[in-house]
């Protein structure tokens, strides 16, 4: 009897172990590459990871803090993430292998999942700095975003269009949004350029602590960038405390990018569950409210992932 009991127990344990191994083998991971915690990418990435963890069977999903666009795309190419947020111009630079933008080789594994919302070039100066125009930045202390981040690439493009170089500034800091704001609060910086969705937390924080001026980027200056990804736009009045008038600027689209190593089924589910649970994204940040499925494939700088393509065909977005 004891022998049969031991055999039965052994078989049960063996079955449990096999089931456990099978379960572990079935579990898949989605690492969502975002940006700094004070930007828009991070809360959106957290929302996406929550959607995927709940809606896709046997999936564990996390949101990773990064330096945003350029780092995200390089991590995707290396297979160190399944989904990333990036600015359109950074995606184009990565696909071409633009070394000056931080891409030492062509990132040929990148695949598109969806367009999202627009980033707005938001140049904010302290009111007592005397800065009111782009030309006034000359001789001032300015943060241009983390080195080789999407924001910093935008800063280079906008400064060049304005006839400015970093050497024209008294001091250049390569800092994430939150750190830039802290230095401005402490009067160690005069201005910060942040490429983000409207109402970004870092600038809202700054505007409640010190009087600010939102510096305009006129439409003719946007045209001088010479990149169709940059379009004239407006930061509406009262987006930030003390900003009482509309301010002209440039807008650049954001995209969700994956890579060719992600299975067709997983890419299909990532696109599908994002749009079937879009209210979760809308609740994460106001900027996300401009994400619409009908715009999902517009202006995609890289080939669409076959899994995402399957979903968009299924819903009649593409033929």
Spell out what each predicted region is.
Residues 81-117, 200:
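Acidic, polar ligand-binding/catalytic clefts
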Residues 31-55, 59-60, 119-186, 279, ...:
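Bilobed "Venus flytrap"/periplasmic-binding protein-like clamshell domains
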Residues 18-24:
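Sec/Tat signal peptide C-region and signal peptidase I cleavage site
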Residues 1-11:
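Bacterial N-terminal signal peptides that target proteins for export
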Residues 179, 185-186, 196-214, 220, ...:
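An extracytoplasmic/periplasmic, membrane-proximal ligand-sensing/linker region
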Residues 88-90, 99-100, 129, 165-257, ...:
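Pocket-lining segment of extracytoplasmic ligand-binding domains
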Residues 25-93:
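N-terminal (or domain-start) structured segment
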Residues 106, 113-120, 207-208, 248-251:
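Short Pro/Gly-enriched coil loops immediately N-terminal to beta-strands
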């Amino acid at each position: 009897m004891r022998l049969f009991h031991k055999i039965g127990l052994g078989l049960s344990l063996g079955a449990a172990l096999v089931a456990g191994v099978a379960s572990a083998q079935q579990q898949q991971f989605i690492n969502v590459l975002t940006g700094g915690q004070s930007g828009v990418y991070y809360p959106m990435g957290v929302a996406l990871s929550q959607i995927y963890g709940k809606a896709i069977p046997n999936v564990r999903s996390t949101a990773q803090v990064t330096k945003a666009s350029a780092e995200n795309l390089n991590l995707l190419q290396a297979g160190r993430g399944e989904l990333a947020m990036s600015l359109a111009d950074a995606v184009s630079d990565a696909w071409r292998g633009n070394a000056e933008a931080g891409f030492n080789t062509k990132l040929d594994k990148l695949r598109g999942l969806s367009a999202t919302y627009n980033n707005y070039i938001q140049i904010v100066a302290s009111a007592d700095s005397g800065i009111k125009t782009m030309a006034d930045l000359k001789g001032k202390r300015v943060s241009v975003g983390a080195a080789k981040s999407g924001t910093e690439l935008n800063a280079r493009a906008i400064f060049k269009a304005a006839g400015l170089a970093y050497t024209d500034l008294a001091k250049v800091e390569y800092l994430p949004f939150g750190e830039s704001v802290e230095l401005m609060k402490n009067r160690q910086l005069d201005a910060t350029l942040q490429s983000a969705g409207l109402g970004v937390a870092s600038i809202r924080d700054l505007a409640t602590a010190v009087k600010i001026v939102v510096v305009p980027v006129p439409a003719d200056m946007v045209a001088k960038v010479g990149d169709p990804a940059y379009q004239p736009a407006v930061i509406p009045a009262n987006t930030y405390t003390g900003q009482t008038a509309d301010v002209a600027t440039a807008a650049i689209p954001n995209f969700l990018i994956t890579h060719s190593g992600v299975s067709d089924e997983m890419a299909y589910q990532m696109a599908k569950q994002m749009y079937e649970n879009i209210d979760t994204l809308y609740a994460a940040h106001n900027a996300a409210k401009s994400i619409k499925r009908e715009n999902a494939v517009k202006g995609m700088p890289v080939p669409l992932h076959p899994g995402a393509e399957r979903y968009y065909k299924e819903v009649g977005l593409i033929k």
